[in-house]
């Protein structure tokens, strides 16, 4: 395979990284406005992200791309597998505000952050500007999470 194929793979990983963060923004905005039914309907779309990330990781492996891309690409795949298992296979609705966090939620959040760090680092392996773009997208996603938490706490105080 040529170097050009590796470049296209990198661009696709960056693109799907941006899609990943955009979908998380949508999920947190839906939660903020208490549209859980719509969020639940979106969960298969979120889980479908597993397909391009796995395919791109396998292609990176097959063309012999450097091990750095393989290592930093793996955490997002692990997170998406866990998310797929939790949402679609167990058919459990997420429990967003427990008094005591169950171990599954702790694992979920750790995998989300580790996957995001890996995804952002992949961007930096490609170029500084792509890495920065993914980090900015991560903070936009975290801002939408903060908005969701703000709305939740505000509604809780109103009760």
Name each model-derived stretch:
Residues 7-34:
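N-terminal signal-anchor/start-transfer transmembrane helix
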Residues 15-20, 69-81, 128-140:
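Hydrophobic core segments of alpha-helical transmembrane domains in multi-pass membrane proteins
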Residues 22-26, 80-88, 138-152:
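Transmembrane alpha-helical segments that form the membrane-embedded catalytic/substrate-channel core
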Residues 29-43, 62-67, 91-99, 122-127, ...:
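Membrane-interface helix-boundary motifs at transmembrane edges
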Residues 36-52, 96-112, 159:
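Juxtamembrane helix-loop boundaries in multi-pass membrane proteins
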Residues 43-71:
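Membrane-helix boundary elements
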Residues 74-87, 98-122, 136-141:
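Hydrophobic alpha-helical membrane segments
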Residues 113-159:
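Terminal transmembrane helical module of multi-pass membrane proteins
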């Amino acid at each position: 395979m040529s170097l050009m194929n590796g470049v296209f793979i990198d661009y696709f990983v960056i693109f799907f990284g941006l899609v990943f963060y955009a979908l998380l923004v949508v999920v947190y905005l839906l939660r903020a406005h208490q549209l859980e039914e719509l969020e639940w309907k979106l969960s298969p779309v979120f889980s479908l992200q597993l397909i391009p990330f796995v395919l791109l990781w396998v292609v990176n492996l097959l063309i012999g791309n450097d091990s750095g891309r393989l290592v930093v690409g793996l955490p997002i795949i692990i997170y998406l597998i866990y998310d797929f298992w939790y949402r679609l296979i167990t058919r459990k609705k997420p429990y967003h505000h427990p008094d005591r966090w169950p171990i599954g939620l702790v694992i979920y959040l750790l995998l989300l952050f580790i996957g995001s760090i890996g995804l952002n680092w992949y961007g930096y392996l490609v170029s500084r500007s792509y890495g920065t773009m993914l980090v900015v997208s991560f903070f936009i996603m975290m801002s939408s999470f903060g908005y969701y938490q703000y709305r939740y706490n505000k509604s809780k105080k109103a009760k």
